[in-house]
Amino acid sequence: MQKQPLWQRSRREVSRLNPAHRVNIAEVAATAGVSVGTVSRVLNESPNVSEKTRGRVMEVMKRLNYRPSRSAESLSRGQTRTVVILVPFLTRPSVAERLAGAIGVLDEEGFDSVVRNVESADQRDRHLAALTARHEADGAVVVSLRLSDSRLADLRTAGVPLAMVDAEAPGVPCTVVDDIRGGSLATEHLLALGHRRIGFIGDSPDDDLGFISTRRRLLGYRRTLARHRISYDPAIVRLGPHSASVAASMARDLLGLPEPPTAIFAASDTQALGVLAAAEKSGHSVPDDLSVVGYDDIESAAQLGLSTVHQPLGESGACGASRLCALIRGQLVRPLREELPLSMVTRTSSAMYAVAGVA
């Protein structure tokens, strides 16, 4: 009796020594007597396979009860099912919330997330160069980082799909907020409470990563003062490295002035927390002696009663990731610029000027 060809045997016959074994693409290829590439082309419905071979491979897949894994399908399409997320200073609460939003969407879409922390321009450029030099991911989400024209050109040439969050670049889908308006919201809130001497604490303008959020929030602050015919006073503006401890030091400096501000607008909640700590240490009651407003509305802001400008951090990360997934699927993303709304959240750290006990 002639021996039955291997490719015509059932899965039970092929896998009887290990009933729990899941058949993979290599076993299909070996059983059908073809290469893995041929099986991949059959899965991908390529026309470059003869009908006879296609039929044999399909018969083997049926007999072995083969079910393509997600990774096998991805490889057949030249995909890694991986997305790189570039974020600056991962430990910052606002960054962590954006990141969580992005990872949640990517996970639902079946992508693994590779997070690259960036703390210098050199780090940023190395990670971007890796994206263009080798196909390590199907695309990238860039959070709060500015990209040079040359780096953008490299990414486009390499065909790397890209979406940005809290940053913009020509021709790239981006998810942003209007930080000028945000600065205005915070300043208007304090002016409505009767404050006229409002200090400002924010980031240094000369960081090598090119962050622009503080500059835009400061611009909103200045424009709002001008609309109310209040002169901008650089003596009550302090800019420095982004941290609660540095902000606390700058706040102590402001509170020690002969004419200290009655309110301080901090360009981030992290910096506002430093202001609150400095006020407590120097014996200034918040909000009786000093009103404080932050920006971001991170999770701890509500717990501490911090008045702040709310921006949808998690939603922004999710939106950026969703737009990238659309690009990877080959869909047209419009509009390129998605602006999310801001709102002023009033809590116990801000109060009327008269209530603050200043005559």
Residue ranges and their predicted role:
Residues 1-81, 354-359:
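N-terminal helix-turn-helix DNA-binding module of bacterial transcription factors
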Residues 66, 119-122, 143-148, 168, ...:
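Short beta->alpha connector loops
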Residues 36-40, 75-90, 197-207:
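Short beta-strand segments enriched in small/hydrophobic residues
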Residues 1-18, 63, 104-109, 157-164, ...:
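Bacterial carbohydrate/catabolite-sensing allosteric modules
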Residues 133-139, 257-262:
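Short acidic/histidine-rich motifs immediately flanking catalytic phosphotransfer sites
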Residues 51, 55, 64-129, 136-139, ...:
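Amphipathic helical "hinge" segments at domain boundaries
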Residues 147-159:
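Active-site-adjacent beta->alpha loops and helix N-cap segments on the catalytic face
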